[in-house]
């Protein structure tokens, strides 16, 4: 009887009847009468009129009980009427009369086979072949039953014996396709894929419409990674059998993997097309939906990414990776509660999912929940002890908590595991700026060695088409991720607004992760003045370098340094003839391709001993120009008038508030009776951080009841108004405040700062001097204390200064955007003229590097393993914009099916799992 999916009845009569052979001789008269009756019976039987035919066969046998042909015909009718035992009696009788009757023997075999007696069936077919080797039906049916025997043996665990039976079947009938097919199945299970493929190909050659063979050929090609060949096999299969569900599912898998392959090779649009085609074959295939989410995330189409991640979860509620990646998208959109919900859902599916544990720690770090963050990141490390970026994020957490030594150790642990971690390498450089003085040369060497290694990861342009005409209009490019409500934005606004665009055309390269109203205002201003605005978030740094060259930028200015989302990889390519670093980082970048670093004579005095890779260019006044927030609100009276006591304060981050700073502050507070200290910092929403801070001050003699600790304030207006809580602002050292100092002064709060030997220490010196408060710049810790005490001693003078300070600041060079920009343009013009005269500091520097012999000692002081090969890594922000702190680079991770890549969007989709739908047909095909 026929078996589903295995039909090899070609060459047999349509009613399944085996041609009979004539029986023994009969008397002439009987033979004539019987022959007519027998012929009519055969006609009735061929028309499926078995009852009528049976009656005629009986009539013949009543007259001639030895008529073999009638016995065979009767047996066939009985078999058709589901009377196998009576039928086999007829066939056996025919064999008794004519032992060499191949037809009767073959029908005996058919009944044995239908009754499940395969061995007896095979013996009957073999006897038929022996009786008449030319009788083809016997050979064909023997091949069938041998194939069935082979399958039975294989299923019983006797694989070798099963293979032997398949081979015997092919010896009997070398054209029997199911035997080849089932051999292919066995060899596939034995992982002998070359043999399996040969067998499937022979099966398809013998039976061109063998859908299952094409399907399983596709599985082998798919598992070998030959996706195009696999897809071609599945297409052939589905042409034969359009509703073959296993083949459709396999096609969806192969197309999904091909989509990932071409996406990784750089053709993301074709990858998306393959993912969508996969859904045509299997509309509920969650892996294709997941990878579409990944692709749309990489294309920055986050709305579509969300749609497909949610679809993936609908069809596969256990897809923890989709939950994780949704969380990353919501995190980047500042929807932290939703992000936490997604990460927690991922962890409910995979409790030890290190990426989601890490990402939850990232969110808690951003929120200042340091204990919870530490717990999550430590769990991520426990789940995966080689998870390098978790150590990077632990370093960021320690840095935010003010534990710089622990932060550096965590970064170095990350670099031990992954020497290529760009985030940890750069975060380490940033953290070293918080360490006390006496470290300057080692800090310089750390930056310099990082820059030399980083440079090797990028090809450098060595020629430019920019015309060397000294006084022609210039194109100035500004590259930054901080064109939103962020500390850098308060200092870049003046040039964007006041540049003479006819002579200094501005091209903005904006890497903003999430644009806000300030972003849109900047963009509108630049475009209306005739500039160009390019959004480069998510674009590879080498591609950004190509854009810079296309835009014919003459001077490219980077505003980020080693803080989050920087484009130092673009600067390493040297796409512009002149390259500059400014504002975003308080030290050298260490990158040899950057010509100049913009500063002033107060932040970096001419006699400074601090070393820089770049050549210093000092602006005529301050190197900073502050554009106050329109949301600041009015200046309030100094609170001491109503309070009756002085309140000192600082809104700098904890990393800047070193133990030495706390010692000096405690000395001031202890010297001013009833005075209070207010400190605002993100981690102060964490009880353990608060208690540690208060305990430290208590050890220094300052009662905790005199200290107010405020957590992060999200709204900019409320943040600015919080300055009304303090009478006097205390700056930090050796890493002084920048935005916080400007905000303090703008809100009428005088700030006491201290000069030092490095730029980071002297930013407050520059700001206060240019505002007209040079008298508040101390040269020592003792003088710092004295200046603070002098201010606190005269509340009336403090009030007068407070109410006049905003006006004083507005008239100072620090807020004079027009004149500041003219000075900046003059500096740019001088740089350009030097270039036209053949003087480019970076080119000289690069030539010298080419001449340096290679050192065998890769371990420089404080620069172990700072290789940054992942040059297109981007990092999460740490601090809120209004705090004005430099941001370390947090790395959140997206998990993928099969692979994880480090990237800020956390949407790293690659190959989907293999679920090869192998079809195993067992050769039961007789009827």
From Swiss-Prot:
Pfam families: Glyco_transf_41, TPR_1, TPR_16. GO terms for cellular component: cytoplasm; nucleus. TPR repeats lie at residues 34-67, 68-101, 102-135, 143-176, 177-210, 211-244, 252-285, 286-319, 320-353, 355-387, 388-421. One of its GO terms (molecular function) is peptide-O-fucosyltransferase activity. The keyword Chaperone does not apply. Its EC number is 2.4.1.255. Residues 422-927 are annotated as: Catalytic region. Residues 1-31 are annotated as: Disordered. GO terms for biological process: cytokinin-activated signaling pathway; gibberellic acid mediated signaling pathway; negative regulation of gibberellic acid mediated signaling pathway; regulation of reactive oxygen species metabolic process. It catalyses: L-seryl-[protein] + UDP-N-acetyl-alpha-D-glucosamine = 3-O-(N-acetyl-beta-D-glucosaminyl)-L-seryl-[protein] + UDP + H(+); L-threonyl-[protein] + UDP-N-acetyl-alpha-D-glucosamine = 3-O-(N-acetyl-beta-D-glucosaminyl)-L-threonyl-[protein] + UDP + H(+). It comes from the Eukaryota. Probable O-linked N-acetylglucosamine transferase (OGT) involved in various processes such as gibberellin (GA) signaling pathway. OGTs catalyze the addition of nucleotide-activated sugars directly onto the polypeptide through O-glycosidic linkage with the hydroxyl of serine or threonine. Probably acts by adding O-linked sugars to yet unknown proteins. Belongs to the glycosyltransferase 41 family. O-GlcNAc transferase subfamily. This is Probable UDP-N-acetylglucosamine--peptide N-acetylglucosaminyltransferase SPINDLY. It comes from Oryza sativa subsp. japonica. The lineage of its organism: Eukaryota, Viridiplantae, Streptophyta, Embryophyta, Tracheophyta. The gene is SPY.
């Amino acid at each position: 009887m026929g078996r589903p999916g295995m039909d090899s009845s070609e060459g047999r009569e349509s009613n399944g009847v085996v041609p009979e052979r004539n029986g023994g001789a009969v008397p002439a008269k009987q033979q004539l009468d019987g022959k007519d009756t027998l012929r009519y019976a055969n006609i009735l039987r061929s028309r499926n009129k078995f009852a009528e035919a049976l009656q005629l066969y009986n009539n013949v046998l009543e007259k001639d009980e030895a008529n073999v042909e009638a016995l065979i015909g009767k047996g066939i009718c009985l078999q058709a009427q589901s009377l196998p035992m009576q039928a086999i009696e007829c066939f056996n009788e025919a064999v008794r009369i004519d032992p060499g009757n191949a037809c009767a023997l073959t029908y005996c075999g058919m009944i044995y086979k239908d009754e499940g007696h395969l061995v007896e069936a095979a013996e009957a077919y073999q006897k038929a072949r022996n009786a008449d080797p030319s009788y083809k039906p016997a050979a064909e049916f023997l091949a069938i039953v041998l194939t069935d025997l082979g399958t039975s043996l294989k299923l019983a665990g006797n694989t070798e014996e099963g293979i032997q039976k398949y081979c015997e079947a092919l010896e009997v009938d070398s054209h029997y396709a199911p035997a080849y097919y089932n051999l292919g199945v066995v060899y596939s299970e034995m992982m002998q894929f070359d043999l399996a493929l040969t067998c499937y190909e022979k099966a398809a050659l013998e039976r061109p419409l063998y859908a299952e063979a094409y399907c399983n050929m596709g599985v082998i090609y798919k598992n070998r990674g030959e996706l195009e060949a696999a897809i071609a096999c599945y297409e052939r299969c589905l042409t034969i059998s359009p509703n073959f569900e296993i083949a459709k599912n396999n096609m969806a898998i192969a197309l999904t993997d091909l989509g990932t392959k071409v996406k990784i090779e750089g053709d993301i649009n074709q990858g998306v097309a393959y993912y969508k085609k996969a859904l045509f074959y299997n509309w509920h295939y969650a892996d294709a939906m997941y990878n579409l989410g990944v692709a749309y995330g990489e294309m920055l189409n986050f709305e579509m990414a969300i749609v497909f991640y949610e679809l993936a979860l609908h069809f596969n509620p256990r897809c923890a990776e989709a939950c994780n990646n949704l969380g990353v998208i919501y995190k980047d959109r500042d929807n932290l509660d939703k992000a936490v919900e997604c990460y927690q859902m991922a962890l409910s599916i995979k409790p030890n999912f290190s990426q989601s544990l890490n990402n939850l720690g990232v969110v808690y770090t951003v929120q200042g929940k340091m204990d919870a963050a530490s717990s999550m990141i430590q769990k991520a490390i426990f789940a995966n002890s080689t998870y390098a970026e978790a150590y990077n994020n632990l370093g960021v957490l320690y840095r935010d908590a003010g534990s710089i030594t622990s932060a550096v150790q965590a970064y170095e642990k990350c670099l031990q595991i992954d020497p290529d971690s760009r985030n940890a390498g750069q975060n380490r450089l940033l953290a070293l700026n918080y360490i006390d003085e006496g470290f300057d040369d080692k800090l310089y060497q750390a930056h310099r060695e990082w820059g030399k290694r980083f440079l090797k990861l990028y090809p450098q342009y060595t020629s430019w088409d920019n015309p060397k005409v000294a006084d022609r209009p210039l194109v100035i490019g500004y590259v930054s991720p901080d064109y939103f409500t962020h500390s850098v934005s308060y200092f870049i606004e003046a040039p964007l607004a006041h540049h003479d665009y006819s002579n200094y055309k501005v091209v903005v390269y904006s890497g903003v992760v999430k644009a806000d109203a300030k972003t849109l205002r900047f963009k509108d201003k630049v475009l209306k003045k005739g500039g160009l605005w390019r959004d480069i978030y998510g674009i590879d740094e080498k591609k950004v370098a190509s854009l810079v060259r296309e835009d014919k930028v003459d001077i490219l200015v980077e505003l980020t340094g080693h803080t989050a989302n920087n484009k130092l990889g673009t600067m390493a390519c040297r796409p512009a003839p002149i390259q500059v670093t400014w504002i975003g980082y308080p030290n050298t970048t260490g990158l040899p391709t950057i010509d100049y670093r913009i500063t002033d004579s107060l932040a970096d005095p001419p006699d400074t001993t601090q070393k820089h890779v770049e050549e210093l260019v000092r602006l005529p006044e301050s190197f900073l120009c502050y554009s106050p927030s329109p949301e600041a609100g009015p200046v309030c009276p100094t609170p001491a008038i109503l309070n009756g006591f002085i309140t000192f304060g600082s809104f700098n981050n904890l990393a800047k508030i070193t133990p030495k700073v706390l010692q000096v502050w405690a000395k001031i507070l202890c010297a001013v009776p009833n005075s209070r200290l207010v400190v605002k910092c993100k981690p102060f929403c964490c009880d353990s951080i608060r208690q540690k801070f208060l305990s430290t001050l208590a050890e220094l003699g300052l009662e905790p009841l005199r200290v107010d600790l405020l957590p992060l304030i999200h709204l900019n207006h409320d943040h600015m108004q919080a300055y009304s809580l303090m009478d006097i602002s205390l700056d930090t050292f050796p890493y002084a405040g920048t935005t916080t100092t400007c905000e303090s002064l703008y809100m009428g709060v005088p700030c006491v700062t201290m000069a030092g030997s490095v730029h980071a220490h002297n930013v407050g010196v520059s700001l206060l001097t240019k505002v007209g408060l040079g008298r508040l710049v101390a040269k020592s810790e003792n003088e710092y204390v004295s200046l603070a005490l002098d201010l606190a001693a005269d509340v009336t003078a403090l009030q007068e200064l407070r109410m006049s300070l905003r006006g004083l600041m507005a008239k100072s060079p620090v807020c004079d955007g027009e004149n500041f920009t003219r000075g900046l343009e003059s500096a740019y013009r001088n740089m350009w003229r030097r270039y036209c005269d053949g003087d480019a500091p970076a080119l000289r520097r690069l030539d010298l590097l080419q001449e340096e012999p290679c050192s065998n000692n890769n371990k420089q002081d404080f620069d172990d393993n700072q290789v940054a090969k992942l040059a297109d890594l981007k990092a999460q922000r740490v601090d809120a914009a209004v705090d004005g702190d430099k941001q370390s680079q947090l790395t959140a991770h997206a998990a993928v099916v099969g692979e994880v890549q480090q990237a800020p969007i956390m949407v790293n989709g690659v190959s989907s799992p293999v679920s090869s739908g192998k079809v195993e047909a067992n050769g039961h095909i007789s009827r």
